[in-house]
Curated annotation (Swiss-Prot):
Keywords: Acyltransferase, Transferase
Top-rank lineage group of the source organism: Bacteria
InterPro entries reported in the protein's UniProt record: Acyl_CoA_acyltransferase (IPR016181), Ectoine_EctA (IPR012772), GNAT_dom (IPR000182)
NCBIfam families named in the record: ectoine_EctA
A GO term, aspect molecular function: diaminobutyrate acetyltransferase activity
Pathway(s) the chain acts in: Amine and polyamine biosynthesis; ectoine biosynthesis; L-ectoine from L-aspartate 4-semialdehyde: step 2/3
TM region(s), chain numbering: none
N-acetyltransferase domain segment(s): 21-174
Family: Belongs to the acetyltransferase family. EctA subfamily.
Gene Ontology annotations of biological process type: ectoine biosynthetic process
Name of protein: L-2,4-diaminobutyric acid acetyltransferase
Length: 178
């Protein structure tokens, strides 16, 4: 080599193949990885028990994205007993390596296609005013389903102990199906 920088033209470039992710129901074994992913992000971190419990008792309404055996994304969600037509999304976690690729939207869409969600007409989540990424995701979900996204006040900051939690606003997307 002559010491000069070599320029490789596009014809000589090596194709980089992005891995295909598997979107599936979580198992209790996935709970710890979901907790770790939440802990390594800006999400509110719940106890590891919460993630394991969601995998055990709410697996029909939760989903994980895996790259091989590694959990790189998840949603914890449930159907509120008094709102059987609504899927409430508690958390969406996406690994830094997967952000900006539409994984959050893919996870939601795959989740609402499940048999357990066949009667779901609305998706709800609470989002803080500073969480612009989640706000954009839920608005994009509404646009992709050509439906409404209504935002209303839910939990004021006065309800939270301490002084470091913003208010939570409800994002309600739907109706999803006629």
């Amino acid at each position: 080599m002559s010491g000069k920088n070599e320029i490789i033209n596009e014809k000589e470039a090596v194709m980089v193949q992005t891995p295909v992710l598997t979107l599936t129901k979580p198992t209790v074994e996935d709970g710890a990885a979901m907790w770790q992913l939440a802990k390594s992000s800006s999400l509110d971190t719940n106890s590891s028990y919460k993630y394991i419990m969601m995998c055990e008792y709410f697996d029909d309404t939760c989903i994980v994205a895996k790259d091989g055996d590694e959990v790189v994304g998840f949603i914890t969600a449930f159907i509120p007993p008094k709102q059987q037509d609504t899927l409430f999304i508690w958390q969406i976690g996406v690994a830094a390596s997967q952000r900006g690729r539409g994984l959050g939207l893919d996870l939601i869409n795959k989740l609402i296609e499940r048999e357990a969600c066949k009667d779901i007409r609305y998706v709800e989540a609470t989002v803080t005013p500073s969480n612009k990424a989640s706000q954009a995701l839920f608005r994009k979900l509404a646009r992709s389903h050509q439906t409404d996204c209504q935002v209303s006040s839910c939990f004021s900051e006065q309800l939270f102990p301490g002084d470091s939690h913003e208010q939570e606003n409800t994002f309600r997307i739907g109706p999803l199906r006629s």
